[in-house]
Amino acid sequence: MVSDNRWVATTKGIVVFLLTALLFVFWYDRDRELAESHVTAVRFGFYRVIWIEVLCGITVAWCVRKKFRFRLPDAGVLLLGGYVLLRSVYGDGMVGYRTEFWILFVILYFLLRLLSSLFRNAVTVMLWTLMGAGLVETIYGFGQLYGRFASGHSLYRLTGSFFNPGPYSGFLVMVLPVVLFYCLSVYPGRQKSGGEWRYKLESGFVWGILLLILSILPAGMSRSSWLAAVAGCGVVTAFYYRIRKQLKELGRKLGKKAWWVAGIGVVCLLLLFSGLYLMKKDSADGRRLMWKIAGRAIAENPWGGCGLGYFGGAFGKAQAAYFATEEATEQEEWVAGSPEYGFNEYLQLGVELGIVGSILFLLAVGLAVRQLLYSSRPEKGAVLGGLTAFSVFACFSYPLSVIPLVIVFVLFMALAGTLDDRKLPAEERKRTVGAWFVMGASLLMAGITWRLTQHKEEWKQAYIRWGEEQRYFSMDIFEETVDHYRDLYPFLKDQPKFLFEYGQCLSKTGQYEEGIRILTEGTRLSADPMFYNIMGKDAEALKHFGQAEACFKQASYMVPHRLYPLYLLAKMYFESGQSEKGRDMARQVIQKAPKVMSDAVKEMKAELKERLQP
């Protein structure tokens, strides 16, 4: 009987390990034929993996037939997922694949809840698997630094399996608190339960990962990841050493001197933040401007937001309106850009899902933290540290837009819902649902997953064809390319880069009105002022000079330090017979200092100088 129980436990452990490991390996398979492969390959890989996870979840539910303890974090996740679903059906519109991913991540959450509830050590197996994924990423990163592996971005040497150093550093700092927890927890006393060899193996494994992560993290040059690492590891250390209790005792011993010690600590923190700010001052000022503009975008549609996927368009319009008021400083004009992300997930959620969506997201995370604080399991420190690192990193970056980082976040949320809750009130601990309900729910999740992932092969083929057509687009072969882009439009109309290329093809082939329509759709998705530049040129070709002027001015307001929109506006004035306006605008362009002096800028200024000559 004992051997049978051990065999069952081993089988469960292998199942949990394999299904967890699958979530951390699929993004290494890069299909280079896909357009935007650094993003789309991961997306289509996730579609395949979630199917495997769901089918295995159904099998586990039917084989084990175990009751499921429904907890408050589960309710928080359901509320958030339900709101996204209702918002997509009854709201102003959402980008389809973004809504699908939110729903699929809710399904993944409950699958991981089921897996982590299979047996008591399931949580430990999942956390060790996560650390293994962190080890692989650090080895991959060192391989890139030493030229053994190719980088995921031409401008950066270190990206891991990601497309730039930011998400790579974010992944490592979410793993780091878990590694630190086990470094503190693996001690010689473990020899009694597993022998000296097990202690040495575990100790060497976790300490090796810790040293590797700490060695490579500075090379990523991500200040947000450093802050997240300090916060996450600080939480783990505080829980392990019960620092709160020790600080109280220290305060009693120091008496009034404690205030001086606290003051010195605050000054040190201020100096630290000042150093981080001065390290990349323009970048920090740019983030601050983005947050200000995001706040203005939230004010435009405070409760429901603009819809998932439409952050770029809402941000671009809000930034143009801000610079049009002439309230901005010269530094703000200098650092303004056209970001794809808000670099603060809480503000971006506010822009896309409104205040209601932001509150529901914070509620779900807050309920998970509450569950951890009530837990009596020691692993709560590791999970809470990981959630803390994610939460801090989300203040300065875009982890909810990177599928691997969302998977780690969902894993932490699921583990928080699973960990033992003996300290909770009795009425909360008794909330369970029967095995038949679990099996029915697993079938429902399978049906939803099938509905959301069917026909994705057609979408994948569309991305492959787009990648092929981009070669002809780059060679300025527009006549045939425009017809192929028209065929791809139903599949790729939520991709701003595709809409921009399609709009340009239409413009180059003289289809100006249709080009304006396609580019206008792109302005809902992107903050790139080039959409308005091309629309302005199309309107000018149609002799709609008032519309062209409005487009060029909008592009100029969106990113004020760029000269190209003003150059186009000056040319349009001259071509339309508005010579006086043209001369005024030409002088403005000639006198304006560009952010980066290039041959193109010199040519534009030289051309306008010729226009000014009598």
What are these regions (language model features)?
Residues 466, 497-501, 530-535, 564-568, ...:
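Alpha-solenoid helical repeat scaffolds
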Residues 12-27, 48-61, 77, 81-111, ...:
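Alpha-helical transmembrane segments of multi-pass inner-membrane proteins
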Residues 489-490, 521-524, 553-557, 591:
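Conserved structural position within tetratricopeptide repeats
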